[in-house]
Amino acid sequence: MVSVVFSGVMYTAVLLGCYDGDTCTLSFQEAPPFLAIQKVRFVDFDTPELGGAKCVSERKLAEKARNLTQGFLEKQGLLYTDGKRGKYGRLLVSAPDLRGTLISKKLARAYSGGKRNGWCD
């Protein structure tokens, strides 16, 4: 179970899976059916792309980042959101502990928008 804090209220969700290290899908238990399944995008960090990997090393890093993110959410799963949505309509969430762990393991980089650097040498 994942807990998501929005406007001081904690909501419960089930992790359906992660596409890569910074994009996952959650099923909110208390939401109306049209809001129940939400893709979420973690803010403040960027991880390697899994589907659009430009080299083998990026794909390997992306798999590690995805696995770490999934494990984090399955064990600790505390996220925060202000309800805003990103460029592709995903709910923007933050997870400071996850961010720090991914960055310390070199599976993510700090990110605040704009052009991103590549992951291939």
Identify the role of each PLM range.
Residues 1-121:
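Small beta-barrel nucleic-acid-binding modules, primarily SNase/OB-fold domains
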